[in-house]
Amino acid sequence: LNQVSDAEKEFGGIRLWGTIGWIVAGQVVGFLALEKNPGDLVMTFKIAGAISLVFGIYSFFLPDTPPPKAGKDVSFREIVGLDALKVLKIKNYAVFFIASILICIPLAFYYGQANIFLNEIGMQGAAQKMSLGQMSEAVFLFLMPWFFRRLGVKYMLLVGMLAWVVRYLCFAYGDLDSGLWMLYLGIILHGICYDFFFVTGNIYTDQVAGPQVRSSAQGLITLATYGLGMYIGFWAAGAIAGANVILDAGGEVTNHHWDKVWLFPAMFAAGVTVLFLLFFKKSEKQDIA
């Protein structure tokens, strides 16, 4: 974000390339049929490791982004990023911050259980079909500036959270027969689920944080969401999925009561949405530094 002049207009186009990476990864897994044999899944880590090494080397050639206080004295508080905590003094941002942590709990259900769910119910090429979600994400990233001008931060975030509710209801009641459309809708909603909440959240954080703490503020929200929120979410997803297993006569897991598994994140996301609607009053665009 330090490299752009207008985050609302430019960030979506930059973030789009990350989405393209997700699409390519899903297509590669499907093309190589790595899901069919659990023993072949080790190849996914080898491919990911090789690509990560290439990008690690490439990162040395990225544009120089010296810290705002380069060459100046800095305090320990600034070094460890504690100065970013001042953004929480803004009431609306504090509400958004808490909602972000909470919404990552149901988010973890998708990341941790969706592929298992689709494979378990018999969907062929689940990883490839899940990349439809990233294709949807690419479309909405392109449309982000248009939605920003018409909806603003609050309603962008609300639409994103509501999409999580609808997605999990689709998974709870969808099947490979007459409910197949619900499964595809649940996958395709990823564009709204992710872009309208998390990408909007990154831009909102950029708006309320001053230039001196912008990077620290982004690090703080990332730690809170993908650290704390996702940790709780993956623990909850594993516990709830484990409590809803279907066993054969030999005690082996053959399936899950997926309707019960998906209803929990649907209800949780609905609760977070209601709380956000009540306590986030309006969009604030101001620097804190």
Predicted regions and their residues:
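A membrane-interface helix-boundary motif in multi-pass transporters
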Residues: 31-51, 239-269
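Juxtamembrane intracellular "pre-TM" segments in multi-pass secondary transporters
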Residues: 63-98
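Multi-pass alpha-helical transporter architecture, strongest
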Residues: 51-64, 258-289
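Intracellular juxtamembrane helix-capping segments at the cytosolic ends
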Residues: 1-5, 196-210
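C-terminal ends and interior cores of transmembrane alpha-helices
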Residues: 162-176
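Helix-loop boundary and gating motifs at the non-cytosolic
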Residues: 92-131, 198
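Helix-to-loop junctions at the C-terminal end of transmembrane segments
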Residues: 33-34, 140-153, 241
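Loop-to-transmembrane helix entry
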Residues: 9-19, 42-46, 119-138, 181-182, ...
